[in-house]
């Protein structure tokens, strides 16, 4: 960036424009506009992201107005949704009154309950704000052609080829260049703009500088963008290529996380601005400059219609009333049960991810037996690792995307000699090379024709088996290239060694420190059971581009298998336990840790590394597996109602069949419905039926000296939970802008994302089928309700120290409540580091 800035200051003089803002002012507007874009992770580890992330410095209401003007986006459900809730009695007059008490930043908002009900139940039209204009809109006005869509399609076609991660076999010849340079090189040969009628494209390309930042400065001057509206204009342009801008924002996020930098987003903005200049040149004779001059004034004089402001204010009040109704109903359940007395020692302690899907299974397991205590913790279980599969030198980050891996753990083969391990590595690598060559033959542009004729019929049997769910359409990447014998023995290796020039494994001191941190963060420091099961989670689906979005977000879009297997090997290590004992943390000799994986699609739990479990615990293990199987049946029965599986059907078979059905658009509901995040000991809410809508994090503040664990919870899991909640929220209230549309129309592009159909922008967020069942919302849009049992002063101090946390809370992006020792809600956070009694 510094080099680009220097280039801007030393560029050759041009004809003085009629409008020349300071270069530093333009750069700052670029920076702010780019920060407004939320990142989009690629499909290989598709994690939930708050789509409003770049606007959390604004209030929820202010962001609703900004996005309405810049993207034509909604931030509330259709008004009929709230009207139905009022008619059914779900939203009461008391809820409407409570919503009105919070006020509205917009003039003309309904002033009382009667007015708000009349607004909801009346026939006043939904607000449709005019979107801030671009030169493409001005060109449309003088030609009648939707140039904004044309430009988006052409940029998307180029981006799909340039950013391709391995799907295409004919790569862009300019892929080695930075994005803007690559686009310019291709555009110099491409005649598509001229054939589409943009005859000024080549002129624009010639007069624009070669660096992205220089181009942005030149275009801003050329188009006379009002300085007071420059950030809004640039943000508006980025939102016109929202998906690709979001992917570029991810590239920057990832680079900065590891101490680097990335300018892809700036390059994309420059590309979009060149198109603005090209359209300006192309239709100059049709008066586009005059039209643009009059339209650009909206960026300075943004005066919305009072009726539109009133409609927006009313809809936002109805959304708040809907959330007040949820609070009234849910809070009445909390504290209504008597906290269970914890036995001197439980037979099993089972720790699960805080994921809302775990709530149903945990409750089922507690129903099966009261001899098992369940615990909630982020699914990476305090072990932020990069896990490198066998025969690879790089792996995926198995931790929340807010963190970087602290350790590199490589796979090896249990019980094998170094020679045998190397042989297994070579065999897998060879199998992968053969498979890649065969795939290239099948899909390459020329050889594919020779493949279909002579070889196609040989695939009839596989096609039938895949359709029946007996086999997978493609091998699972975790086991691909391994023979059955090796597959059973592949496991993480903790011993330090060198792989690809990097040190893998963990020293004893690192293992002890990691174990201590994990156990304290779980509030698991005493009263250990004979068996302690650490249960990660993953999902089983086929033909699903967004499959990793159903895996563990706390594990970076991977399953939690690697984390729990690493954690268990460390916690069962006698040397580690000796080190923990020196630190005052004593694990009984008869306590054995187990690694398990909860399949959230089928509710089956797999226990790993059984060969390492001592014979003394064989009976305990057998009994636990029976309990887990029984809990799975209960959980499947509960979930079957939402999946619309009939009661006369064999539910277990039907659920498992869905997981293998490649025509199934809803194999499971994921985190749809997520609404609450509870941080407290489990006995405060045990027995409360939360319907898989609550993240449950175990926490005992009396054991948290200095409140370091509380600070970690409020700055990591709470943020991640809000990202998940707001992704579902955005995908529900406006799937066009914040979601990915109809799953049945998806086409994967570059293995990194999806298009809806064969053109248009890269899609962000969740498919419509992930939030709606075809008749009604399965995810009810509401902001996350965070409830924490901890001293209010401690929570307030943490909020004051962390700007992002304070912005989320003070600006109304999530709610925060305090719980007492009985699990009842006692206080709510009202902003400005202040609380009030509920």
Curated annotation (Swiss-Prot):
InterPro entries: DabA. Keywords: Cell membrane, Membrane, Metal-binding, Transport, Zinc. It is a peripheral membrane protein. It comes from the Bacteria. Its cofactor is Zn(2+). The keyword Metal-binding applies. GO terms for cellular component: plasma membrane. Its main location: membrane. Zn(2+) binds at residues 353, 355, 537, 552. One of its GO terms (molecular function) is zinc ion binding. It is found in: Cell membrane. The keyword Cell membrane applies. Belongs to the inorganic carbon transporter (TC 9.A.2) DabA family. Forms a complex with DabB. Part of an energy-coupled inorganic carbon pump. This is Probable inorganic carbon transporter subunit DabA. It comes from Roseiflexus sp. (strain RS-1). The gene is dabA.
């Amino acid at each position: 960036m510094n080099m680009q800035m220097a280039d801007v200051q030393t560029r050759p003089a041009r004809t003085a424009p009629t409008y020349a803002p300071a270069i530093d002012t333009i750069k700052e507007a670029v920076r702010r506009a780019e920060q407004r874009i939320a990142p989009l992770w690629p499909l290989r580890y598709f994690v939930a992201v708050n789509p409003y992330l770049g606007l959390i410095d604004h209030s929820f209401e202010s962001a609703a107005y900004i996005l309405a003007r810049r993207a034509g986006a909604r931030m509330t459900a259709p008004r009929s949704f709230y009207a139905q809730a009022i008619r059914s009695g779900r939203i009461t007059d008391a809820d409407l009154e409570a919503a009105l008490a919070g006020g509205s930043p917009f003039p003309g908002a309904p002033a009382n309950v009667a007015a708000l009900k009349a607004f909801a139940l009346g026939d006043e039209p939904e607000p449709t704000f005019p979107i801030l204009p671009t030169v493409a809109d001005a060109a449309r006005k003088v030609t009648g052609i939707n140039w904004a869509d044309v430009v988006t399609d052409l940029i998307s076609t180029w981006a799909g080829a340039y950013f391709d991660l391995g799907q295409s076999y004919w790569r862009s010849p300019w892929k080695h260049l930075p994005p803007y340079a690559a686009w310019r090189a291709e555009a110099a040969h491409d005649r598509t703009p001229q054939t589409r009628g943009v005859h000024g494209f080549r002129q624009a390309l010639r007069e624009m500088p070669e660096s992205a930042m220089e181009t942005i400065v030149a275009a801003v001057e050329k188009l006379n963008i009002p300085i007071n509206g420059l950030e809004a204009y640039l943000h508006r342009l980025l939102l016109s290529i929202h998906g690709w801008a979001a992917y570029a924002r991810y590239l920057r996020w990832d680079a900065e996380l590891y101490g680097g930098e990335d300018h892809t987003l700036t390059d994309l903005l420059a590309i979009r601005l060149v198109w603005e200049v090209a359209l300006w040149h192309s239709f100059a004779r049709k008066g586009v400059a005059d039209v643009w001059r009059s339209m650009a004034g909206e960026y300075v004089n943004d005066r919305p219609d009072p009726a539109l402001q009133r409609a927006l204010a009313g809809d936002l009040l109805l959304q708040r009333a809907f959330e007040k109704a949820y609070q009234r109903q849910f809070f009445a359940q909390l504290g209504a049960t008597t906290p269970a007395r914890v036995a001197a020692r439980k037979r099993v302690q089972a720790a699960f991810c805080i994921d809302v899907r775990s709530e149903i299974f945990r409750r089922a397991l507690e129903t099966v037996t009261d001899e098992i205590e369940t615990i909630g913790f982020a699914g990476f279980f305090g072990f932020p690792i990069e896990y490198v599969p066998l025969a690879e030198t790089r792996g995926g980050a198995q931790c929340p995307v807010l963190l970087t891996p602290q350790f590199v753990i490589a796979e090896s083969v249990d019980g094998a000699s170094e020679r045998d391990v190397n042989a297994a590595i070579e065999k897998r690598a060879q199998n992968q090379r053969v498979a890649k060559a065969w795939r290239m033959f099948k899909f390459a542009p020329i050889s594919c024709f020779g493949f279909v004729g002579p070889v196609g019929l040989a695939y009839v049997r596989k096609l039938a088996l895949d359709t029946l769910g007996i086999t997978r359409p493609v091998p699972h990447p975790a086991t691909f290239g391994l023979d059955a014998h090796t597959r059973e023995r592949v496991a993480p290796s903790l011993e330090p060694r060198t792989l690809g020039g990097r040190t893998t494994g963990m020293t004893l001191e690192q293992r002890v420190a990691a174990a201590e941190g994990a156990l304290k963060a779980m509030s698991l420091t005493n009263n250990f059971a004979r068996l302690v099961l650490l249960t990660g989670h993953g999902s089983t689906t086929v033909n699903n581009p967004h499959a990793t979005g159903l895996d563990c977000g706390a594990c970076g879009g991977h399953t939690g298998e690697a984390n729990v297997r690493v954690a268990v090997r460390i916690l069962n290590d006698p040397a580690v336990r000796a080190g923990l004992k020196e630190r005052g943390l004593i694990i009984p000799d008869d306590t054995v840790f187990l690694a398990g994986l909860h399949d959230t699609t089928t509710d089956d739990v797999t226990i790993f590394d059984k060969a390492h479990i001592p014979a003394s615990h064989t009976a305990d293990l057998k009994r636990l597996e029976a309990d887990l199987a029984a809990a799975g049946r209960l959980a499947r029965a509960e979930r079957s109602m939402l999946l619309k599986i009939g009661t006369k059907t064999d539910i277990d078979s039907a659920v498992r069949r869905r997981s293998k059905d490649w025509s199934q658009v809803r194999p499971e509901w994921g985190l749809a419905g997520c609404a609450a995040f509870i941080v407290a000991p489990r006995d405060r809410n045990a027995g409360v039926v939360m319907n898989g809508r609550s993240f449950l994090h175990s926490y005992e503040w009396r054991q948290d000296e200095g409140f370091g664990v509380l600070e970690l919870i409020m700055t990591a899991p709470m943020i991640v939970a809000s990202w998940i909640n707001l992704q579902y929220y955005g995908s529900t209230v406006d799937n066009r802008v914040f979601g990915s549309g109809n799953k049945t129309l998806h086409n994967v592009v570059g293995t990194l994302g999806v298009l809806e159909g064969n053109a248009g922008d890269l899609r962000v967020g969740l498919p419509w089928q992930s939030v709606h069942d075809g008749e009604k919302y399965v995810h009810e849009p509401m902001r996350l309700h965070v409830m924490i049992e901890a001293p209010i002063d401690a929570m307030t101090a943490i909020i004051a120290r962390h700007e992002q946390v304070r912005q989320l809370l003070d600006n109304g992006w999530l709610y925060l409540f305090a719980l007492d020792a009985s699990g009842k809600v006692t206080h709510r956070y009202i902003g400005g580091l202040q609380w009030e009694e509920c």
